[in-house]
Design a protein with these regions (language model features):
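Short E/K-rich amphipathic alpha-helical oligomerization segments
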Residues: 67-82
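Compact alpha-helical subdomains of small soluble proteins
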Residues: 78-145
Length: 145
């Protein structure tokens, strides 16, 4: 009786030892066929043609557009209840961070030097005003509203 039980266990283990190495072979072939080589697409830098003055002007325009949207609501809670407006602000925040990154990568410290067309005080004043309204564009598309 014990012999039959041991024989069944032995047969089961032998069966698993033979079958298990081949169990995963079919899945790998299917996965390899299904995978399409991914081509990394570099995002188009829409701000690449701007100079320092253009960067400042574009940043102020984005801040002004965002402020206009925010000011069309009495409270931040009212703004949050309108998904379309929230999406517009997130899109502007994303554009703002892309602009900052692009301009900083090209001009580095030059964007921090005030000039007639690079009015850093106005930019900071508008950014602070928007921040006081509850929107921090520097957070980009991760902006919490």
């Amino acid at each position: 009786m014990a012999f039959k039980k041991n024989l069944k266990i032995f047969n089961f283990i032998a069966f698993l030892a033979i079958i298990l190495p081949f169990a995963g072979c079919g899945d790998g072939a299917k996965k390899k066929q299904a995978e399409v080589p991914k081509i990394a697409n570099k995002p188009l830098d829409i701000y690449s043609k701007l100079d320092v003055c253009g960067c400042n002007k574009e940043a102020i325009e984005i801040i002004d557009l965002t402020t206009d949207i925010r000011n069309s609501f009495k409270t931040i809670k009212e703004l949050k209840s309108k998904p379309k407006s929230v999406e517009q602000i997130r899109s502007l925040a994303s554009s703002y961070t892309k602009l900052l990154e692009s301009c900083f990568n090209r001009y580095a410290s030059k964007i921090f030097i005030p000039s007639d067309c690079n009015n850093l005080n106005e930019l900071e004043r508008k950014r602070t005003e928007l921040s006081n309204l509850g929107i921090q564009l520097e957070q980009g598309e991760r902006l919490k509203l």
